[in-house]
Amino acid sequence: KWGSIATRGHRDELIPHIGTSNGSRNPRRNYLIDLPPRFPAEFPRDFDSKNYTEKDNTRLAYNAYLKKFLRCVRGIDDNLARLFKHLEETGQMDNTIIIYTGDQGFMLGEHDFQDKRWMYEESQRMPLLVRYPKSIKPGTVIDSCVENVDFGPTMLDMAGLKVPASMQGKSFKKHLETGKEPEGWKQTAYYRYWMHMVHHDNPAHVGIRTKTHKLIYFYGCNYDGGYQTPPGWELYDLSTDPHETINLYDDPNHAELVADLKRQLAETRKRVGDDGSHYPAAEKVVQEFWDYDLKDRQKAQMISREFLKRREAELKAGKRNIRTHQGFQEASYPE
């Protein structure tokens, strides 16, 4: 099934506490709590969630958010139209490199999650359109692994400027001009989310994506190694399961693939300078659960139970905004 102990708990006990929900699934972070006071006009007059079913509440909260989201998108589109009109009227349209992208994707209810900060497809993948008819053939589609660190080098390259050696990314100008992936181009994309359980109850995680598979490691702690959630691994076959509904990490048929992706992930972390040396307390947790043997899994189960107790105590005390990204909390996990 989808997810892991990191996103569901040992026996699904953490489903109410991981990730912002549309309806009331997550009692700390959900749009049914947050949106009615902010946008009362998007809900029925004198709205009280107690008078509606969970299904209706979820629908109302989801639609309220989606309307706001799409209005933002429409605002961007309208202003892009103004810009393009100006470029056309001044004769600069075909002499201008237009790059349309975003800093990340966005969850709009998939897995009952909202916002970004996940390595799942809807959040990790970004829109990327490039127009420059002088050298890019209209309708060109490339399927190369491109990351946001590649944007800067590409812009400099297209402007005829030298790309500094200090920049991590590589120019994909040749991809755009030829429609083909150059030999030796990277075959993976790297992902890291570190603000553990801060804005939308997202556990800290790191991972790697190829064109066909994705490996996610939820190490589940802040930079001080504290506020732990259960560590867990997830593997998805994007060619057969594009919506990431079946975690294949424990499937024996994928053991060799898991080992290879872990090797690539470790190498990538070193290559990009995210090897954990700057935050040794967090890296200690990362390494502790890297192999994920029986002992690791048993400890993850205990962490899941301990986190549930902590979260329930916080909710009972009326604490919604907990300082999760810093500090270390002592735990009672036996060695």
Regions found by a protein language model. Give the residues of each.
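Carboxylate-dense, calcium-coordinating segments in secreted/extracellular and ER-lumen proteins
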Residues: E244-L248
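Short amphipathic alpha-helical coiled-coil/interface segments
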Residues: L261-L265
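Active-site-proximal cap/lid insertion segments
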Residues: K1-V146, M158-S166, D224-G232, N253-E256, ...
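C-terminal cap/loop subdomain of S1 sulfatases and analogous C-terminal strand-loop tails that border
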Residues: Q104-E110, V149-G152, D157-E234, L238, ...
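Charge-rich, acidic-biased intrinsically disordered regions
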Residues: I99, A282-R297
